[in-house]
């Protein structure tokens, strides 16, 4: 039975995620016992908003072909497609075929666009991404293989229609060996699949909705992946020196290893000790800088800001559906601006900036605290996108009105936790919230 192209790309991004997804699919199909069912992290599933935007992006190109270029476009997106139906449409010699669903011995998938040029074929894949990624090229390799197998025609060119609404030609030559090796690994992996033996999840893989399952394995194995911000290549260097767990790193007598700076190695040893000593209710930490990097004392007029958004709804920035402002005054006042669409988002952004500017008239020395650099990056992208308050925002940044508390925490503390999220750091201050904070 052929494999879906989307699952092949999932395997490229993470063999562990692919194994989990395959296992759940087999359980749902009642081909293996229900005891193998794996819980997913629903918050990591692709949002409906993103799927809608992706579909709209495809329609933009379809309308460009159909209306702007006056091409004959056959739409197979809503048809019961098969190789036979597709070949029948191809015989009619249209200019473009939209979303045919075709299969070869190894793979099955729905291509975005097949363009007929003389006796040759072009493949165009629509992506919301702002740049070409290797996974896009791997996907085009599979599409080309399927299409050439089914039609016996040559695919001479492949393109990506990216978020900038431009065509980007893809060159395959330097990726041929990568694709061949990846396909072999994929086929071998499926031939030896065992629901009892998952591949080990590696740091840096796109674990998607199976990230919690990966964390369970890391915790069970006391894996080095639990160390804060450690990279896969650093884990390999430690394993090459017979250091395979957090406890082994904590107890090693080594003071340095090849390929890793001495300062970095010592930092990870200290983090391993703190992590090993931490419990669910009490997190161990060490103060590196007692001044907390010059953190100012809180004063009247200081504000605390936080945003929530959907990724990739608009190219280059998030759709910010919530701007929040909390004031540490006697009323603990909280102001928020909610948006259901991009027009409302602009109004919310304008209201948010105007609120800050008005606040500074009352409290000229006020600081606006946030956690991580996300808020500043988001504000800059929104100001540029909406064409409002760009100058005023830059002035606020230059005057250092915004204070990133994460920078202070990261430079001042070593924490025995896998994450320096706000939810984690709050525990150090004895704060326990009921809300499930994401940052």
Task: Please describe what each predicted stretch is.
Residues 1-116:
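Metal-dependent nuclease catalytic cores that hydrolyze phosphodiester bonds in DNA/RNA
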Residues 20-21, 111, 134, 227, ...:
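Short helix/loop capping segments that flank catalytic or ligand/cofactor-binding pockets
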Residues 22-23, 74, 198-203, 283-288, ...:
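Short coil/turn segments at secondary-structure boundaries
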Residues 54, 58, 179-182, 242-243:
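Short amphipathic alpha-helical coiled-coil/interface segments
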Residues 67, 243, 254, 388, ...:
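Short aromatic/hydrophobic-glycine micro-motifs
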Residues 78-80, 89, 93-104, 108-190, ...:
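Conserved DEDDh/DEDDy metal-dependent 3′-5′ exonuclease domain
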Residues 171-237:
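Long, highly charged, low-complexity intrinsically disordered interaction regions
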Residues 208-327, 333-334:
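C-terminal extensions
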């Amino acid at each position: 039975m052929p494999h879906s192209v989307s699952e092949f790309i999932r395997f490229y991004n993470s063999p562990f995620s692919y194994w989990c997804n395959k296992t759940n699919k087999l359980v749902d199909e009642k081909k293996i016992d229900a005891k193998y069912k794996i819980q997913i992290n629903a918050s990591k599933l692709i949002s409906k908003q993103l799927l809608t935007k992706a579909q709209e992006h495809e329609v933009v190109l379809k309308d460009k072909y159909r209306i702007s270029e006056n091409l004959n476009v056959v739409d197979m997106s809503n048809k019961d497609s098969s190789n036979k139906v597709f070949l029948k449409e191809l015989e009619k010699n249209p200019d473009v075929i939209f979303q045919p669903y075709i299969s070869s011995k190894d793979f099955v998938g729905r291509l975005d666009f097949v363009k007929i040029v003389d006796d040759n074929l072009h493949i165009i894949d629509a992506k919301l991404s702002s740049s070409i990624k290797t996974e896009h090229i791997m996907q085009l390799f599979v599409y080309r293989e399927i299409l050439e197998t089914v039609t016996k025609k040559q695919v001479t060119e492949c393109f990506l229609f990216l978020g900038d609404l431009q065509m980007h030609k893809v060159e395959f030559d330097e990726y041929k060996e990568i694709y061949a090796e990846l396909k072999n690994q994929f086929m071998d992996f499926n031939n030896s699949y065992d629901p009892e033996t998952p591949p080990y999840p590696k740091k840096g893989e796109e674990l998607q909705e199976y990230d919690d399952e990966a964390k369970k394995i890391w915790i069970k194995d006391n894996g080095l992946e639990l160390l804060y911000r450690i990279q896969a290549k650093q884990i390999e260097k430690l394993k090459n020196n017979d250091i395979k767990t957090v406890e082994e790193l904590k107890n090693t007598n080594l003071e340095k290893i090849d390929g890793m700076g001495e300062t970095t190695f010592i930092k990870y040893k200290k983090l391993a000790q703190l992590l090993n000593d931490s419990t669910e209710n009490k997190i161990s930490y060490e103060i590196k800088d007692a001044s907390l990097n010059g953190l100012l004392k809180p004063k009247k007029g200081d504000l605390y800001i936080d945003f929530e958004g959907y990724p990739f709804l608009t190219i280059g920035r998030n759709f910010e559906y919530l701007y929040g402002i909390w004031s540490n005054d006697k009323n603990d006042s909280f102001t928020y601006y909610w948006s259901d669409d991009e027009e409302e988002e602009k109004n919310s952004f304008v209201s948010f900036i105007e609120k800050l500017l008005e606040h500074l008239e009352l409290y000229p020395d006020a600081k606006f605290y946030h956690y991580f650099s996300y808020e500043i990056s988001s504000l800059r992208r929104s100001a540029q996108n909406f064409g409002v308050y760009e100058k005023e925002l830059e002035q606020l940044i230059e005057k250092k009105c915004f204070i990133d508390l994460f920078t202070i925490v990261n430079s001042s503390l070593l924490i025995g936790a896998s994450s320096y999220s706000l939810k984690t750091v709050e525990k150090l201050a004895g704060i326990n919230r009921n809300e499930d904070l994401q940052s």
